[in-house]
């Protein structure tokens, strides 16, 4: 009996599966600024290239699950989508983020 699933998940040009090389989903917890996002994406891209592993850049545009009402939540959907598109085109990385409500999928 095999414990390997017979499926794979592909995000952009990165495939995650038991029979594929190691790949990472990595990035800052919260999208704080364009400069910070580019600094992180650049550092992660350099590391993944150097190690020869796939990378999907992941960060959240809205941290809705804060324990403090005064906690930072992020840059919001519209501004973040522009930054995500720029990260994709500048670094050639697929970008992943959280979905909080059904409406955000439309």
Feature annotation, model-predicted:
Residues 23, 29, 67-70:
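Short glycine- and Lys/Arg-enriched binding-loop motifs that mark or flank ligand-binding interfaces
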Residues 6-8, 55-64:
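Glycine-rich, aromatic-flanked loop segments that form ligand/cofactor-binding clefts
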Residues 23, 40-51, 58:
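Glycine-rich beta-alpha loop segments
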Residues 15-19, 45-52, 85-90:
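Acidic (Asp/Glu)-rich catalytic clusters
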Residues 1-24, 82:
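N-terminal amphipathic alpha-helix/helix-capping segment at the start of soluble metabolic enzymes
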Residues 59-106:
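N-terminal active-site wall of soluble small-molecule enzyme domains
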Residues 23-27, 55-59, 95-97:
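Hydrophobic faces of well-ordered beta-strands that scaffold small-molecule active sites
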Residues 30-46, 75-82:
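Glycine-rich anion/phosphate-binding loops
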């Amino acid at each position: 009996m095999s414990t390997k699933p017979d499926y794979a998940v592909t995000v952009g040009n990165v495939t995650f599966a038991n029979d594929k090389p190691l790949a990472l989903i990595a990035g800052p917890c919260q999208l704080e600024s364009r400069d910070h996002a580019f600094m992180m994406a650049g550092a992660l891209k350099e590391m993944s290239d150097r190690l020869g592993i796939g990378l999907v850049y992941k960060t959240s545009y809205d941290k809705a699950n804060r324990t403090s009402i005064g906690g930072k939540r992020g840059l919001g959907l519209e501004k973040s989508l522009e930054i995500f598109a720029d990260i994709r085109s500048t670094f050639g990385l697929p970008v992943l983020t959280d979905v909080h409500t059904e409406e955000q999928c439309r």
